[in-house]
């Protein structure tokens, strides 16, 4: 099990069922040292208001030895790579994930999807691209992986893609992992939990990584220190409380 989980949703995204406190309790139970709350960006129908993300600044950094990152799963809005995260939201957030979601950006052809994803990667605003192996959004995998490595953006392997959502992702995700390996980039693992019970579950992700002999030292989740070094290299100020992790 990895001690870091980078993708989950709370009751603020109303199709999810757990609170911040629920995740903290489950993290303590499972030995998760650091996690990121990444509720859906405000352009989704049941997403929280942008004030929700701005007000994350009131959260404690550390609760009972568990570190909490303030994040968002933003929506890629168009082929220019614009996302539904802006202004003061950036000032409060540590981690920006962005991906395709049908209510905001309908599936297009491979060329258009690739253009939108690369523009998002190149924007400098995003740390991780969520579920890039979604079969509803075909992309040029090699081009995406090379762009991500160039711009120091991680591509996600999403455990939920193999269980509850985005069925048929396995082949695409193996291709993503292999392309990231060859490009010398990073992968991020996300449980994409919508309930705290699945926090830290990367069982299916591990199968994908093993299938392509993915190097362990290019997985952001291997330790809090690895993930924090990545974020700090992208401009996040060091968080003194996280020195205890």
From Swiss-Prot:
Binds 3 Zn(2+) ions per subunit. CDD domains: PHP_HisPPase_Ycdx_like (cd07437). It is an enzyme of class 3 (hydrolase). Its cofactor is Zn(2+). One of its GO terms (cellular component) is cytosol. It comes from the Bacteria. GO terms for biological process: bacterial-type flagellum-dependent swarming motility. GO terms for molecular function: phosphatase activity; zinc ion binding. Zn(2+) 2 binds at residues 15, 40, 194. SMART domains: POLIIIAc. Keywords: Hydrolase, Metal-binding, Zinc. Its EC number is 3.1.3.-. Pfam families: PHP. The keyword Iron does not apply. Zn(2+) 1 binds at residues 7, 9, 73, 192. The keyword Zinc applies. Zn(2+) 3 binds at residues 73, 101, 131. PANTHER family: PHOSPHATASE YCDX-RELATED. Belongs to the PHP family. NCBIfam families: PRK09248.1. Homotrimer. This is Probable phosphatase YcdX. It comes from Salmonella heidelberg (strain SL476).
């Amino acid at each position: 099990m990895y001690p870091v989980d980078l993708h989950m949703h709370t009751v603020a995204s109303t199709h999810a069922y757990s609170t911040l406190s629920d995740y903290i309790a489950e993290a303590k139970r499972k030995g998760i040292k650091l996690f990121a709350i990444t509720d859906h960006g405000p352009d989704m129908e049941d997403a929280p208001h942008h004030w929700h993300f701005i007000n994350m600044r009131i959260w404690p950094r550390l609760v009972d030895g568990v570190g909490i990152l303030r994040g968002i799963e933003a929506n890629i809005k168009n082929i220019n790579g614009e996302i539904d995260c802006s202004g003061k939201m950036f000032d409060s957030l540590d981690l920006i994930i962005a991906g395709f979601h049908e209510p905001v950006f309908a599936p297009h052809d491979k060329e258009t999807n690739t253009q939108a994803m690369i523009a998002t990667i190149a924007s400098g605003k995003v740390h991780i691209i969520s579920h890039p192996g979604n079969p509803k959004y075909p992309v040029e995998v090699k081009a995406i992986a090379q762009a991500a490595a160039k711009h120091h953006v991680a591509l996600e392997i999403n455990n939920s893609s193999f269980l509850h959502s985005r069925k048929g992702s396995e082949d695409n995700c193996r291709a993503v992992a292999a392309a990231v390996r060859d490009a010398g980039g990073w992968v991020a693992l996300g449980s994409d939990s919508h309930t705290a019970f699945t926090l830290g579950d990367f069982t299916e992700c591990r199968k994908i990584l093993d299938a392509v002999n993915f190097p362990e030292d290019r997985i952001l989740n291997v330790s809090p220190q690895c993930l924090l070094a990545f974020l700090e290299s992208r401009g996040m100020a060091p968080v003194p409380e996280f020195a205890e992790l």
